[in-house]
Every structure is written in structure tokens, then in C-alpha cells.
Design a protein with these regions (language model features):
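N-terminal basic, low-complexity leaders that serve as flexible interaction/assembly modules and, when applicable
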Residues: 1-65, 424
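Active-site acidic/histidine proton-transfer and metal-coordination neighborhood
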Residues: 30-33, 74, 78-81, 90, ...
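Catalytic domains of carbohydrate-active enzymes, especially glycoside hydrolases
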Residues: 37-44, 68-97
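Active-site beta-loop-alpha junctions enriched in small/polar residues
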Residues: 49-51, 96-98, 135-138, 183-185, ...
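Gly/Pro-rich active-site loop or hairpin
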Residues: 55-74, 193-199, 233-244, 266-353
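Glycine-/proline-rich flexible loop or hinge segments
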Residues: 59-69, 93-106
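Flexible, acidic glycine-rich loops studded with aromatic residues
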Residues: 283, 302-422, 426-432
């Protein structure tokens, strides 16, 4: 079998003093952080579409990265060699990442199964697992007006067949999750759009997908990935709050959770921390696409995460909900257009993995010391008993509350201590 990364050493942990660019400075998979090994906390995954299909092409220029793999099988072989050498335990893929469209739908399905069986062999040889699979319902021209929300039921049926087969392949490969991202599920103009009907159709599609997943014995999480725009002007999975409302409106909240991406949060006008915290607060945080955007740009740049201070807050949320499993941290990120060498793929992932590993260590210490949770607990302490407890228990009404307010008089102002808390977090960031 051809090897593609023979010139790259296996990536090992060497510690923060190492100057080796092909070594982890903070990610030590076997190190214990609390009750779990670091690898179990982080559950890193490589995104096949960026890492093995990306060429650096953009709207202004053709691809710059020339990769040595050509056939679908070669792409799979290169991927698993990369996973193993990097030390990533998981991967994610779209059906079209490994298996191109055929002349007919039947041929497309046959090609997908053939390549997935090849991937299964590589999984068994390497021990690398599938974090999640998904269907590409946005690239082909048939999906220019959506898949589940397309005005043509023939397109809806085609999308259903594609998802049906990809659910089967994800199940065959032992995938722990399945993701739905509606890149074309939305509109460019309301002049030709029936909003209610399209969202009804999307809900019906998701119910059918969940039914079929259970029918074939798939017990993994079903996840929806929010994104407000790009490629569509307005997407129905705009942000975490929108998706939660959609799930609850259509009776899907007990069947789906969310896969939250950092860059998508920024495009929706939110911080990564906000979107993760909101999903977790509703018990719907299932997995994370780990990347970052550029605050000066208005599109999905999908850069590798390098900002430890941003990630610390996210890791606190994950620790507070006792982990992401069966979800994980998938690097939905790509090297820059001018980063054309194979070794750049390793540098990018090493940086992302070290960023999350260091953030995990810092977040764990903050949680252990209780410096934030203790303040929050005290800040809301008035709701632990008395009138506050009755409010939370819905055991009071406006008449009683008015009497209480008249008796108590003007409430005393209490500082939110934002600056102090920011200094505390900085102390943990700086003291290593």
C-alpha cells in the first residue's frame, strides 16, 4: 500500500518546553484530568472534507494544494495513515468526500458502499473510529434550492435516498453520531418562498430520518449543525436558539441534539462560548466543530483554533455537563490557501489539539477551585429559599410579589464583578 506521510514522524507528547514542531506541547492523551484521561475528555476528530478533499481553491482562484492521492480508495488510505500518525482517535466524513456521484443514483450508492467497506477495513486495522457521518446535500446542482426544503418533491426523495444510505453506512462503520447541516435549507428571497411549508417539509424529513435510524438499529446521536448563512442568504438552522425553537415546535427535541461550530456562532453574531453554553443549558449540546473565524471577515474562514482564552470558557461548559461523549471535538478547519505542503496539515492539527488540551487543563483548575461557580452560586443565592424559591417553584403570583416589593422597599444594587472575574480567568491563563 502506498504511503503518503513517510517523511513525517509519529506525533508524540514532549511537553511545553519542546521546540519540536512535530510534537504536542500540551496534549498528552494518557494524562489524567480529573476522573478521565485527556483523550477521553477531548475525543479529537479529523474532518475528511477539508483535510483530504480541500485544494485551497476560493472564488478568486483555482486550487493551490496538489495532493498525491487520486482515487477514492487512495484518499481513504491517506486519511487513515494521517489519523494514526497524528494520534486522532476519530474522523468525520460526508458521503461525497470519499465516493463521487455516479451516472445514476444506484451507481452512486454502490460506489459509496464499496468505499465505506474499504474504510471499515482501515478502521479495523488502525483502531480509529467514526465520530459522525453526514450526507452532502448542498454541492450538486439538484440541491440549488434546498434538499428537504426544495419545492420539487423529486429532489426531496433523492435527498431522502442519499441520507438513508449514509445512515446505513454510518451504522455499518460504527459511527457514534450522524449530523444534518442544511447549507441549502433556507432562501435567497422571500418573493418565491413558502416559509411555513418549507419548514414543515424539513421537520417531516428529520422525523423520517430519525425513524429510519432507529429502524436499522442505529443508536447514535442525531445532530443538527446551526449556521445562519453561506451558501444560502438565510438558513433555517440560523443559530442555537433558532434550532432549539424549531426542534420544540415540531416535536423533535427528544430526537436531536446540536453540533455547534465556532465560526458559525460568529457569523450569527454570537461568541462560540455563548452558543455552546446555550445548547448545554437546554440539555442539547451533542458535539462540537472546533475551529475559529476571522473577526474582520464576514464569511466562514474555518481556521484552526489557536485562541486558548476563547476555548477555556467552552471547556468549562463541557466539564460542567460531564463531557461530550458520544460527541467529540471535530476539526472542521482547513489550512490556508498558501499552506500547500503535506506537513502543514500536521502543524495545523497539532496547534488545534494543543489549544484545546491547554484550555482543558486551565478550565479543570478553575472548576476545581470554584472561583467562578462559587461567585455565580452566591449571586443567585436569593433564589435558594424564601420568595426566590417560591418564584422558581412557581408557587407565588403577582399579588404576593407586589406585597413583597412594597414591604422590602428599593433593592440594594449588587455589583456583577465582571472585571474581577476577568482578572481571575487571566490569572489562570498567565500562571502556567
Amino acid at each position: 500500500m502506498t504511503t503518503y506521510f513517510a517523511h513525517i514522524p509519529t506525533i508524540q507528547f514532549e511537553g511545553p518546553d519542546s521546540k519540536n514542531p512535530f510534537a504536542f506541547k500540551h496534549y498528552d492523551p494518557s494524562a489524567r484530568i480529573g476522573e478521565r484521561a485527556m483523550a477521553d475528555h477531548l475525543r479529537f476528530s479529523v474532518a475528511s472534507w477539508h483535510t483530504f478533499c480541500g485544494t485551497g481553491a476560493d472564488p478568486f482562484g483555482v486550487g493551490t494544494a496538489v495532493r498525491p492521492w487520486r482515487t477514492p480508495e487512495e484518499r481513504v488510505d491517506a486519511a487513515f495513515e494521517f489519523f494514526k500518525k497524528l494520534g486522532a482517535g476519530y474522523y468525520c466524513f460526508h458521503d461525497r468526500d470519499f465516493a463521487p456521484e455516479g451516472a445514476t443514483l444506484a451507481e452512486t450508492h454502490r460506489t459509496l458502499e464499496k468505499v465505506c467497506r474499504h474504510a471499515l477495513n482501515r478502521q479495523q486495522e488502525t483502531g480509529v473510529k467514526l465520530l459522525w457521518g453526514t450526507a452532502n446535500l448542498f454541492t450538486h446542482p439538484r440541491y440549488m434550492c434546498g434538499a428537504a426544503t426544495n419545492p420539487d418533491p423529486r429532489v426531496f426523495a433523492h435527498a431522502a435516498s442519499q441520507v438513508k444510505r449514509m445512515l446505513e453506512m454510518t451504522h455499518m462503520l460504527g459511527g457514534e453520531n450522524y449530523v444534518f447541516w442544511g447549507g441549502r435549507e433556507g432562501y435567497d428571497t422571500l418573493l418565491n418562498t413558502d416559509l411555513k411549508r418549507e419548514q414543515d417539509h424539513l421537520a417531516a424529513f428529520l422525523h423520517m430520518a430519525a425513524d429510519y435510524a432507529r429502524e436499522i438499529g442505529f443508536r447514535g446521536q442525531l445532530l443538527i449543525e446551526p449556521k445562519p448563512k453561506e451558501p444560502t442568504k438565510h438558513q433555517y438552522d440560523f443559530d442555537v436558539a433558532t434550532v432549539i425553537a424549531f426542534l420544540k415546535t415540531y416535536g423533535l427535541a427528544d430526537r436531536f441534539k446540536l453540533n455547534v461550530e465556532a465560526n458559525h456562532a460568529n457569523l450569527a453574531g454570537h461568541s462560540f462560548h455563548h452558543e455552546v453554553a446555550l445548547a448545554s443549558a437546554h440539555g442539547l449540546l451533542g458535539s462540537i466543530d472546533a475551529n475559529r473565524g476571522d473577526q474582520l471577515l464576514g464569511w466562514d474562514t474555518d481556521q484552526f483554533p489557536t485562541d486558548v482564552s476563547e476555548v477555556v470558557g467552552v471547556m468549562l461548559v463541557i466539564l460542567n455537563q460531564r463531557g461530550l461523549a458520544p460527541g467529540g471535538l471535530n476539526f472542521d478547519a482547513k489550512v490556508r490557501r498558501a499552506s500547500t505542503d503535506l506537513e502543514d496539515l500536521f502543524h495545523a492539527h497539532i496547534g488545534g489539539m494543543d489549544t484545546f488540551a491547554l484550555a482543558l487543563k486551565i478550565a479543570h483548575q478553575i472548576k476545581q477551585d470554584g472561583v467562578l461557580s462559587g461567585f455565580i452560586r452566591e449571586r443567585y443565592g436569593g433564589y435558594d429559599d424564601g420568595i426566590g424559591r417560591r418564584i422558581e417553584d412557581r408557587n407565588t403570583d403577582f399579588k404576593e410579589l407586589e406585597k413583597y416589593a412594597l414591604d422590602e422597599g428599593e433593592p440594594e444594587l449588587r455589583s456583577g464583578r465582571q472585571e474581577k472575574l476577568e482578572n481571575i480567568v487571566n490569572h489562570y491563563l498567565w500562571r502556567r
